[in-house]
């Protein structure tokens, strides 16, 4: 799945219902001790088939801001 800044995604937050929001940032890890990619590269687009470590920042419809690892993204909506 290709994810782009501005896409709406569904994120597994280990609850009954996933959380949905708009991607505001994509970070790719460049070192093993930074799995979320906070100190890594910020990109505008990422293909999850590449299976890199990293994370997204996203904002819900009501303005709450969260982040999630790539592995938590369920789908692009």
Identify the function of each model-found stretch.
Residues 1-14, 22-24:
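Short coil-to-beta transition motif at edge beta-strands of beta-rich domains
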Residues 4-5, 26, 32-33, 50, ...:
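Serine/threonine-rich, low-complexity intrinsically disordered segments
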Residues 46-77:
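Intrinsically disordered, low-complexity, charged/polar segments
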Residues 18-32, 40-43:
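Short beta-strand-centered aromatic/proline hotspots
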Residues 1-2, 37-50:
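Short linear motifs in intrinsically disordered
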Residues 14-15, 48:
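Short polar/acidic secondary-structure junctions
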Residues 15-17, 62:
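Short loop/turn positions at the edges of beta-strands in beta-sheet-rich folds
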């Amino acid at each position: 799945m290709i994810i782009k800044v501005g896409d709406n995604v569904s994120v597994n937050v280990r609850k009954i219902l996933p959380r949905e929001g708009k991607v505001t940032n994509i970070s790719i890890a460049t070192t093993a001790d930074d799995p979320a990619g906070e100190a890594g590269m910020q990109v505008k687009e990422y293909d999850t088939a590449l299976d890199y470590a990293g994370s997204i920042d996203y904002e819900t419809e009501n303005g709450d801001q969260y982040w999630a690892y790539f592995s938590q993204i369920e789908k692009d909506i």
